[in-house]
Amino acid sequence: MTELAAVSFVYPDLDALAAETAKIAVLVPAEGTLNPGARRLNRLTKGAVARAVESAAFEKLKSGESLSLGYPAGMASDEVILVKLARNAKPLEARKAGAGLGKTLGKEGLLIWAAGLGQVAELAFGAALRAYRFDARKSKSEDALGPITVCATKRDEAEAAFADRRAVAEGVFFTRDLVNEPANVLTTTEFADRLTAMADLGLEVSVLEEADMEKLGMGALLGVGQGSESPSKIVVMKWMGGGDGAPFALVGKGVVFDTGGISIKPSAGMEDMTMDMGGAGVVAGVMRTLALRKAKANVVGLVGLVENMPDGKAQRPGDVVTSMKGDTIEVINTDAEGRLVLADVMWYAQEEFKPCAMIDLATLTGAIIIGLGHENAGVFSNSDDLSGAFLKAATAEGEGAWRMPMGPAYDKLIKSRVADIKNVGGRAAGSITAAQFLGRFVKDETPWCHLDIAGTASVSSATDYAPAGATGWGVRALDRLIRDGYEG
C-alpha cells in the first residue's frame, strides 16, 4: 500500500528557520499582516517576503492559493511558499490550502508554519491527502517523499485532532491503490487476499466462493463472471464496535475488469475499465478507516468481485438468470453487469445482517457522467432522511454529490417480455433506470442509497486532493456519515 507521508506537529521555533532545509510554507492573511514566522523569514530574506506580500501577484491570489520564492538568500531552504489564508479559515478552506502544499512535497520535505491557525489538523489532512503518487508498477520508483512538519501553537491539540484524519487518509490511499492497479495484478483473488489481510486490523473478514453462491441461488452475480478464468467472490468485512445494534451496510460493485462481455465495449478507452471495481474499493477504504480509528459503530462491508469477459462460456444477450431474491432477469446487455452483481450482494446483505440502513456504490453508468460530469456522484434513495444525511456529510467533506429522481414511472422502461425484469432500458434516463433496477432488491423496511460514482471514482486530470487517476471519492463522506449518525 502507498504509505502516507510522515506528518508530525511541533511547537514553533523561530531560531530554527534559517537552517531548515525543507521547503518552508508560511500563512499570510489577505490583509498581508506578517505573523512572527513570516517576520523572521522576511528578515532572513532581507525583505523579500514583505515585497512579495505587497505585490499584485499576491493580491490576486484566492484564499488557499500560494506564491513561491525560489532559492531565497539567507536561507538553507530552497523555497519559501507564502499561502494566503486567514487564521480563522473554515475547515475546508484550510484543507484545500494544505492540499496545495501537499502537491509540492518532494524528497526534501515540507515545514508548514501554521502557528495561530485554528484548523491546523485540517491543513495537515489536506497536505497528506494530496501527497499521493502511485508508482508501484514502475521499474524505478521516484525518491521517497520527505516528511510534513507542522508548526502549531497548540501542538498537542492539533496532533490529537489529526489522529482520526490520518485514519481517513489511509483509507483513501487504500482505495486509490486498489482502483489504480492494473487488472492483471488486481484479480478477484488478489483483491480478496488484500481485504482478508485487513483482519490484522481487527476486522472480521470472510469470503464466499462460487460454490457458496450457487447454494444461495446467486444466479445474477454468477452469470457475470462465468466467462472469466478468475473466480467470482464475495468478501464480507465486519466491524462491530458499537454494541448490539443492527449494522450499517455498505455494498460495493467490484468488477475488476469490464470488457462488456459479449456486448463488448469499443477498444478505445477499454484500458480504463480497470477502475470498474471503484465501488468495492471505496467500501474497502471505509472499512479500513473504521478499523484504524476504532469506530464505535457496527458496519458491514460487502463487495462482489467478478471479471466480465467474453468467452465460450460467457453470458449472452437474451439469457434469463435467477437472482438470490428469486426474481428472474432478462440480460439485454451484458455490459450492464454491475447491477446484476449488486442485486445479489444487496439481497444477501439484507438477509444475513438485517441492516439499519444500506448504501451501495458502483461505477454503474456512463449516463451519470453525461448528467453530472466528474464533479458530482449521483445519489438515488428511497429515504429522504438517509439521503439528506449523506448529502450533508458529503458537503462537509467537500465531496460532490447530487440527488437524482426515482419513481415507478421509470419501471416500465425495464419491463421484460420474458422475465420479471430486464437489466437495461433504452437510452432515456439510463442512470435512473439502473437505480430503479437496484431498488427491486431493497426490502421495504431498509433505508437505502445508491451512489453512482462512475464520474468521480477516477479522473483524467488532477483534483484539489488527488493527482490524475483514482480519487478515493466517498471514503471521507461515508466515514463522516457513520461518525455523525451511527456511532454510539
UniProtKB/Swiss-Prot annotation:
Pfam families reported in the protein's UniProt record: Peptidase_M17 (PF00883), Peptidase_M17_N (PF02789)
Reactions the enzyme catalyzes: Release of an N-terminal amino acid, Xaa-|-Yaa-, in which Xaa is preferably Leu, but may be other amino acids including Pro although not Arg or Lys, and Yaa may be Pro. Amino acid amides and methyl esters are also readily hydrolyzed, but rates on arylamides are exceedingly low; Release of an N-terminal amino acid, preferentially leucine, but not glutamic or aspartic acids
Organism field: Dinoroseobacter shibae (strain DSM 16493 / NCIMB 14021 / DFL 12)
GO cellular component, one term: cytoplasm
Gene3D superfamilies: Leucine Aminopeptidase, subunit E, domain 1, Zn peptidases
Principal subcellular localization: cytoplasm
Annotated positions binding Mn(2+) 2: 253, 258, 276, 337
Binding site for Mn(2+) 1: 258, 335, 337
Cofactor note (record): Binds 2 manganese ions per subunit.
Gene coding for it: pepA
Active-site residues, record numbering mapped to chain: 265, 339
Enzyme class, first EC level, given as a word: hydrolase
Presence of the UniProt keyword Cell membrane in the record: no
Function: Presumably involved in the processing and regular turnover of intracellular proteins. Catalyzes the removal of unsubstituted N-terminal amino acids from various peptides.
Keyword hit for Repeat: no
EC number from the UniProt entry: 3.4.11.1, 3.4.11.10
Protein name, entry field: Probable cytosol aminopeptidase
